[in-house]
Design a protein with these regions (language model features):
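Function-determining surface determinants
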Residues: 1-171
């Protein structure tokens, strides 16, 4: 697989850089997500995917002006993945707090651990189902790639902008 392009071309527009860089970042993100959604991933591995999701979403948000509102549905899907993975991480973090603050043989701790295990299993199942439905459908990677690789158009306003030293015309 070809390595994604991560370097910014200062001579190119933001749209041109997006067109050049984002498809590779997308493929790397989908590859990681698919690997973890199709196996028995640990909460720690899923937390790393959450961080990767956050980085990828923030990167796309930087380029939103190049793509316009059509990018919003894709960003919403990434936000949902990030939220689901955050809930899994919350269960793991709560489990660590139980270890630190409750006696090992405490009945309260045992009940809370059972609850957290069940909730973690439930949240992982929800994440995997959402990933399957929204990111792993047949052709989904190609749809994302086509969208991000499309040539972005420069937006221009209807009225010309005044140049330095020129006065706006009175109409």
């Amino acid at each position: 697989m070809a390595q994604p392009v991560y370097s910014w071309d200062e001579a190119a527009s933001a749209g041109r850089n997006a067109h050049r860089m984002l498809p590779g970042l997308l493929r790397a993100y989908f590859e990681e997500g698919r690997a973890l959604a199709s196996q028995k991933a640990t909460p720690q591995e899923l937390h790393r995917l959450r961080l990767a999701t956050k980085r990828f979403r923030y990167t796309l948000e930087v380029f939103r002006p190049c793509y316009g509102p059509g990018l919003d549905a894709r960003l919403a899907g990434l936000r949902k993945i990030q939220q689901q993975l955050g809930e899994i991480n919350d269960c793991a973090a709560t489990g660590r707090l139980l270890n630190e603050h409750l006696a090992p043989r405490s009945p309260v701790r045992a009940r809370l651990e059972r609850f957290l295990r069940a909730r973690t299993v439930q949240k992982i199942a929800q994440f995997k189902a959402f990933w399957q439905d929204h990111f792993d459908r047949p052709g989904e990677l190609e749809r994302w790639t086509d969208y991000l690789a499309r040539r972005t158009t420069r937006r221009t306003s209807a009225a010309p902008r005044p140049t330095a030293g020129s006065a706006p015309s009175a109409s």
